């Protein structure tokens, strides 16, 4: 267990600024109780039991003016998130009252916390490792219940345990190899060492490669699928967007060229966050504003993870339709044949067979879009296996890929008959890379950069 480090006492508002039922101002540090007590009228906070909530008032110690009626939570080290003394002042929600209390605490000796500093202290004091700290932010940013499930498992230590167990096995292997090198007098020691190294390296590589296979699904659930809705003007793109969102975000008219910009919204499709991009209809136009929208649409198409191409079933294919079919053919594409509630005139024989006939007006077959997304990105395997550990963070994925490369270097060296003591270098490098994931071997600059992405008060 890490020994709690000595820091100054920090404070910040932990709830979003604005009107609300409750606001929370948090303190953490050695002097948290004394500073809170200096502005609190009620029980002596320095004498109350840990993990209790205490009623009272916040007052200005200079004037005696009551600032607010509050409930104050007292949590004593080390059984707190930061492993320091923590005080949370529960106020009435609102910008003025929370800011006033924050300024009082700063005047009484607390320092304004940096973004993510509470979680950073939890990391530095050994309460969480780096993957668990990152999971805190993932929980805050989760857009679906599936994304939250993955983040909660990571916070619970599932990824940490896997990485730490693997690092320990690598360390055990390195120790055994070192012992064998130190006792070369046995005739078969070199052969035994090579066999051990080959077996364990392949075992480690297989484990990490299996973990990498979860990255595609995990990253999608964490970051969402960038989804471009494309089609020529007035085929129903904006109506589809509104249908998926179940609210009117896009202008819907019979006038071609109404959507002149790119509209972005998130929607939860069976646990998958889709970043829906409703693009301006792609067509040749002399309207300068519309031209800009069309160019942005083409860019959105190029960058999209998923393309929803909308065609009009009540009209024959146009040159614009054919151009869009060609433009999107190399994408992860779902072709949607809209307006099937009208008389059908489109030439089906000229279209791929896996299209989905829909009617945005009557909500026909919208559920089939969700099923097709599952087929395209998850091979019908479902989204989240309850006991599985997923990679979802780009930093983790990159480091696991580097670790696999180091293990491949060991295997290549074994195949070439390189001396075992040279191969130890690459295996040791694998151990170090995995340590960067949990923070055991992460540089200070990386740690500072990661926590700077957190919000104030967390």
UniProtKB/Swiss-Prot annotation:
Residues 224-378 form the TrmE-type G domain. One of its GO terms (molecular function) is GTPase activity. Keywords: Cytoplasm, GTP-binding, Hydrolase, Magnesium, Metal-binding, Nucleotide-binding, Potassium, tRNA processing. Binds 1 potassium ion per subunit. It is found in: Cytoplasm. It is an enzyme of class 3 (hydrolase). (6S)-5-formyl-5,6,7,8-tetrahydrofolate binds at residues 26, 88, 127, 458. Its cofactor is K(+). Its main location: cytoplasm. Gene3D superfamilies: P-loop containing nucleotide triphosphate hydrolases, Probable tRNA modification gtpase trme, domain 1, tRNA modification GTPase MnmE domain 2. GO terms for cellular component: cytosol. GTP binds at residues 234-239, 253-259, 278-281. GO terms for biological process: tRNA methylation; tRNA wobble uridine modification. Its EC number is 3.6.-.-. The keyword Disulfide bond does not apply. The keyword GTP-binding applies. Pfam families: MMR_HSR1, MnmE_helical, TrmE_N. Mg(2+) binds at residues 238, 259. K(+) binds at residues 234, 253, 255, 258. PANTHER family: TRNA MODIFICATION GTPASE GTPBP3, TRNA MODIFICATION GTPASE GTPBP3, MITOCHONDRIAL. Homodimer. Heterotetramer of two MnmE and two MnmG subunits. Exhibits a very high intrinsic GTPase hydrolysis rate. Involved in the addition of a carboxymethylaminomethyl (cmnm) group at the wobble position (U34) of certain tRNAs, forming tRNA-cmnm(5)s(2)U34. This is tRNA modification GTPase MnmE. It comes from Streptococcus pyogenes serotype M12 (strain MGAS9429). The gene is mnmE.
């Amino acid at each position: 267990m890490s020994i709690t480090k000595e820091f100054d006492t920090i404070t910040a508002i932990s709830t979003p600024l604005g009107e609300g039922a409750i606001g929370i101002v948090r303190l953490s540090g050695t002097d948290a109780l004394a500073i809170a007590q200096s502005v609190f009228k009620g029980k002596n906070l320095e004498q109350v039991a840990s993990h209790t909530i205490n009623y009272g008032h916040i007052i200005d110690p200079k004037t005696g003016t009551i600032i607010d009626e509050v409930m104050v939570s007292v949590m004593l080290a080390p059984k707190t998130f930061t492993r320091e003394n923590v005080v949370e002042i529960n106020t009435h929600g609102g910008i003025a009252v929370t800011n006033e209390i924050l300024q009082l605490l700063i005047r009484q000796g607390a320092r304004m916390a940096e973004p993510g500093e509470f979680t950073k202290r939890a990391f530095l004091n050994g309460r969480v490792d780096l993957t668990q700290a990152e999971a805190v932010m993932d929980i805050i940013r989760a857009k679906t219940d599936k994304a939250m499930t993955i983040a909660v498992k990571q916070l619970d230590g599932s990824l940490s345990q896997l990485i730490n167990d693997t690092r320990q096995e690598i360390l055990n292997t390195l120790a055994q190899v070192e012992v064998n090198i130190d006792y070369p007098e046995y005739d078969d020691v070199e052969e035994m060492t090579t066999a051990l190294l080959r077996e364990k390296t392949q075992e480690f590589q297989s484990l990490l490669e299996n973990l990498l296979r979860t990255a595609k699904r995990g990253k999608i659930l964490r970051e969402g699928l960038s989804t471009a809705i494309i089609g020529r003007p007035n085929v129903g793109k904006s109506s589809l967007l509104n249908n998926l969102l179940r609210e009117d975000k896009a202008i819907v008219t019979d006038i071609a060229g109404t959507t002149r910009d790119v509209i972005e919204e998130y929607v939860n499709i069976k646990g998958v966050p889709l970043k829906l991009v409703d693009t301006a209809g792609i067509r040749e136009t002399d309207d300068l504003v519309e031209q800009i929208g069309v160019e942005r649409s083409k860019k959105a198409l190029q960058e999209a993870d998923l393309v929803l191409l909308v065609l009009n079933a009540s009209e024959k294919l146009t040159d614009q339709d054919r151009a869009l079919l060609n433009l999107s053919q190399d994408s992860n594409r779902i072709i949607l044949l809209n307006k099937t509630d009208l008389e059908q005139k489109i030439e089906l024989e000229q279209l791929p067979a896996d299209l989905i006939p829909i009617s945005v007006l009557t909500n026909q077959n919208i559920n089939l879009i969700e099923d097709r997304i599952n087929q395209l990105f998850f091979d019908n395997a479902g989204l989240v296996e309850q006991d599985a550990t997923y990679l979802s963070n780009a930093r983790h994925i990159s480091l696991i890929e580097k670790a696999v490369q180091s293990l491949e270097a060991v295997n290549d060296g074994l195949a070439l008959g390189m001396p075992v003591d040279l191969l130890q270098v690459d295996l040791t490098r694998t151990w170090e890379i995995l340590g960067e994931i949990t923070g055991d071997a992460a540089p200070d600059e990386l740690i500072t950069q990661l926590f700077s992405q957190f919000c104030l008060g967390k």
